[in-house]
Amino acid sequence: MLDVDNLDLENLLKKYYEKTNEKIVFVNKDGKVIAMNDAAEEIISKDNNYSAMTNAICNRCEGYSNEFALQSCINCYLDTTKPNDMNFQVFMKTVDNKIQPFTASYQCIDDEAQIYAFTLQDISPQIERQEKMYQRQMLRKTIAAQENERKRISRELHDSVVQEMLNVDVELRLLKYQQDMAQLIEKSEHIELLMSNLINDIRDLSVELRPSSLDDLGLEAAFKSYFKQLEYNYGLNVVYQSNIQTIRFDSEIETVVYRVVQEAIFNALKYAGVYEVEVTIQQTEEGLIAEIIDRGKGFDPNLKPQGTGLGLYGMNERAELVKGTVNIETHIGKGTIITLEVPV
């Protein structure tokens, strides 16, 4: 350890206090701000007529991060007369009304006099770098997912639509050589069946990409059609309850709700190992709530998700487009509950 006498140490600390970019605020036992450095003026102007830390800080605070939310005021770090020493991430509004993230600490520095230090370090550059890295990572995954989807559609077209069309083409070519009327009728009926299968394949693919019933009739009709298709194609029974009936919502909201429910069911079908899913759509005073329940395998939310992880990520991203939220409750062996809430 460096040998620094008390005078030099006091001088160094004073210089640090005056020149650091770290915002430092000292508070007494009554919560009153007794001193702060110049850097703290970016958050609290000395022209403010504040008398207590909670008034001065709370007016500029946009919430702190906890295990439940990115920005929350629940169980505020300043809400107790004898706070524990703690470190956390907080969002503060600067004097020019820009919201910035900070690493904050709130610590008792003098037990006898009960003096506390509230410090803030701007972490905007780190957050921006992390976001850019995350965006690049998600862009790569999105591009990969798009390519996989294109491959899937290509296979669907080749294996079903193109094959059916080739069969029809062959049957039509043979038809002109038929002399017997009975065989002619039989071949014609077979071509009819092939054409019917072809139409169904194209319709299924079209519905999967974008159901016309969603635009024309709304969520209720689109869901009922989609659930019938799921039962026919995959043997999945969807127990459906709703109070929206023929109510129409904003087009963007309907699209988000439909896609989130679709993705949740797809995940259950692919990973949960179930043959039945419960879907409930309710309009309440708070907004539109969609709940998707499967009683399958469940998963550990702390582990890397199966597949690309874009399904869960996409649900959250879609919900945010309409100021909605997605909550996922899951336990291994007990299934998964996905709840989407959208203000309307």
Swiss-Prot record:
Identify the enzyme class.
transferase
Q: Where in the cell is it found?
A: Cytoplasm
For this protein, the Enzyme Commission number is: 2.7.13.3
**Positions bound to [4Fe-4S] cluster:** 58, 61, 73, 76
Keywords for the protein's UniProt record, in alphabetical order: 4Fe-4S, ATP-binding, Cytoplasm, Iron, Iron-sulfur, Kinase, Metal-binding, Nucleotide-binding, Phosphoprotein, Transferase, Two-component regulatory system
Q: Which one of the record's GO molecular function terms can you name?
A: phosphorelay sensor kinase activity
Task: Give the catalysed reaction(s), semicolon-separated.
Answer: ATP + protein L-histidine = ADP + protein N-phospho-L-histidine
Under the heading PANTHER family, the entry gives: NITRATE/NITRITE SENSOR PROTEIN NARX-RELATED, NITRATE_NITRITE SENSOR PROTEIN NARQ
Q: What does the UniProt function comment say about this protein?
A: Member of the two-component regulatory system NreB/NreC involved in the control of dissimilatory nitrate/nitrite reduction in response to oxygen. NreB functions as a direct oxygen sensor histidine kinase which is autophosphorylated, in the absence of oxygen, probably at the conserved histidine residue, and transfers its phosphate group probably to a conserved aspartate residue of NreC. NreB/NreC activates the expression of the nitrate (narGHJI) and nitrite (nir) reductase operons, as well as the putative nitrate transporter gene narT.
**Protein name stated in the entry:** Oxygen sensor histidine kinase NreB
Q: Which organism is the protein's source?
A: Staphylococcus haemolyticus (strain JCSC1435)
